[in-house]
Amino acid sequence: MVTNHIQKEIFKQDVDPLCRLCCKENKTILHIVSGCEMLAGMKYTERHNKICQYLHWCILQDFHIPVNTDWWKHKPKPAVLISNKVSVTYDLKQEVDIAVEANRPDIVVLDEKEGRALIIDVTIPMDINMVKAAAGKYKKYRDLEIATKNNIT
């Protein structure tokens, strides 16, 4: 993808390398995909929500819960769906026995039958930030993981 920054630095064209939206950073792929503060409030959130929507749709299908045939038409609601001792919550505060600061992940799959819980909180970092982002999410939800385990065992 040829950005203004590439046109200026590689092709030596006389163009302004700054992002036209924020006018603060050079318009690089990294900036467009995950760094522009003007896109942060809308496009990044929209991308995050679409991924959560798709994951929620897939999870419900795996548990044979009826859903729309097209994932993009699926409308997850912050509610609990229960089927065979399995609950799937979407953007819902998790109720546990102890006070937990981070208690609202994107999706939680609670399988009481198997004694397992899956906590999903989506982040979409650039490749270079993947390990840091994963570690941050793990740390953020560690207390919720422990409290949830205690509730189902």
What residue spans do the PLM features occupy?
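Metal-dependent nuclease catalytic cores that hydrolyze phosphodiester bonds in DNA/RNA
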Residues: 23, 44-61, 65
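Nucleic-acid nuclease catalytic cores
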Residues: 146-153
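Active-site metal-binding core of divalent-cation-utilizing nuclease and nuclease-like domains
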Residues: 13, 66-119
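Short functional micro-motifs and their immediate structural scaffolds
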Residues: 27-28, 41-44
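Short beta-strand-loop-alpha-helix junction that forms the active-site gateway
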Residues: 104-105, 115-136
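Helix/loop segments that flank and initiate small ligand/metal-binding modules
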Residues: 1-26, 50
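Cys/His-coordinated zinc-binding microdomains
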Residues: 23-24, 37-40
